[in-house]
Amino acid sequence: MVDPQSPITPHLYPQAIQLKLYQAFIFSIPILFSIILFLLFYLFYLKRRASSLSSPSPMILPVSSSHQTSSHLPSVCLLDVKVELKDKLHVVLFNEELGTRDSLCCVCLGEFELKEELVEMPLCKHIFHLDCIHLWLYSHNTCPLCRSSVSISSTKTSVDDDNDHPDSPQTSPV
């Protein structure tokens, strides 16, 4: 008869446990490696996405930067022209008379409020919120609604024409 306390039985039991632990360890290593690799790729994706969202656009770059390259110089000159253009635009206060023409800004789709400062485009006479049209003019040279050209020369001539002939209608360029 086999003695229940024979040395063979306790010796086989720990080997079976060791084998199962070894197999579990071997199978868990690739799984853990895959999870870590997936997390690293996900963090890399999140970092790239956050940096692309927080990176400033060319119109927000500081003009007085001392380490500008030659590729930034045209945008700086363009930025100066845009600032000069926005200073030349006619600012009006919203009233009932303007409310019959336009009641909301087509840039932000927000409604105009009474006595709110708005910008009137020189040729087409469309009106927009002050901040909305300034943001628009940083990247465009046209009216957001009808796409008529807005330039410094057309703004000056429009102001001169208004002073010479206040009753004459303005025509938009084709």
From Swiss-Prot:
Probable E3 ubiquitin-protein ligase that may possess E3 ubiquitin ligase activity in vitro. It comes from Arabidopsis thaliana. GO terms for biological process: protein ubiquitination. This is Probable E3 ubiquitin-protein ligase RHA4A. Its EC number is 2.3.2.27. Disulfide bonds: none annotated. Keywords: Metal-binding, Transferase, Ubl conjugation pathway, Zinc, Zinc-finger. GO terms for molecular function: transferase activity; zinc ion binding. Residues 155-174 are annotated as: Disordered. It is an enzyme of class 2 (transferase). The keyword Membrane does not apply. It catalyses: S-ubiquitinyl-[E2 ubiquitin-conjugating enzyme]-L-cysteine + [acceptor protein]-L-lysine = [E2 ubiquitin-conjugating enzyme]-L-cysteine + N(6)-ubiquitinyl-[acceptor protein]-L-lysine. Expressed in stems, flowers, cauline leaves and roots. InterPro entries: ATL1/ATL16-like, Znf_RING, Znf_RING/FYVE/PHD. The gene is RHA4A. A zinc finger (RING-type) spans 105-147. Pathway: Protein modification; protein ubiquitination.
